[in-house]
């Protein structure tokens, strides 16, 4: 395996549209290590969409989990997406969205918003343990 220190793409006609890494073992395909001794978050991986016209509900980035089915077809079994909920300066809100294959169709199963967790499209909540609800909480059933 190459021991690269840097990958540099430069020049007016140099474009890297897709970087593909292939690993024939179950070892890490990508390992990002920080040796910083401080308490700040590290290492950091950033997915940035630099849109000239950002809008509410825009997707910002996505992590896809792919595999193959029994017909040897590539399938996106699940994905995690970042979205803009509110783009207004000073009141920005974001969403983390979870999608899974459900009966053969891509289905949004959960959204984590700034003020709530939504379980969608007949996704159930199952808890192995206790759910503690504070005395001053309002619980609506049905």
Regions found by a protein language model. Name each.
Residues 2-7, 12-68, 75-79, 92-101, ...:
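Short Gly/Ser/Thr-biased coil->beta-strand turn/linker motifs
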Residues 83-87:
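Short beta-strand micro-motifs enriched in acidic
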Residues 70-71, 88:
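Residues at alpha-helix boundaries and short interhelical turns
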């Amino acid at each position: 395996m190459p021991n690269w220190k840097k990958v540099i793409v430069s020049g007016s006609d140099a474009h890297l549209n897709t970087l593909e890494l292939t690993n024939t073992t179950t070892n890490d395909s990508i390992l990002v290590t920080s040796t910083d001794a401080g308490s700040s978050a590290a290492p950091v991986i950033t997915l940035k969409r630099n849109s000239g016209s950002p809008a509410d509900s825009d997707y910002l980035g996505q992590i896809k989990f792919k595999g193959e089915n029994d017909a040897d077809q590539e399938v996106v079994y699940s994905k995690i997406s970042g979205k803009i909920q509110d783009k207004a300066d000073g009141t920005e809100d974001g969403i983390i969205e979870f999608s899974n294959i459900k009966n053969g169709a891509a289905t949004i199963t959960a959204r984590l918003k700034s003020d709530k967790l939504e379980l969608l499209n007949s996704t159930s909540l199952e808890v192995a343990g206790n759910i503690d609800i504070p005395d001053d909480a309002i619980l609506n059933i049905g």
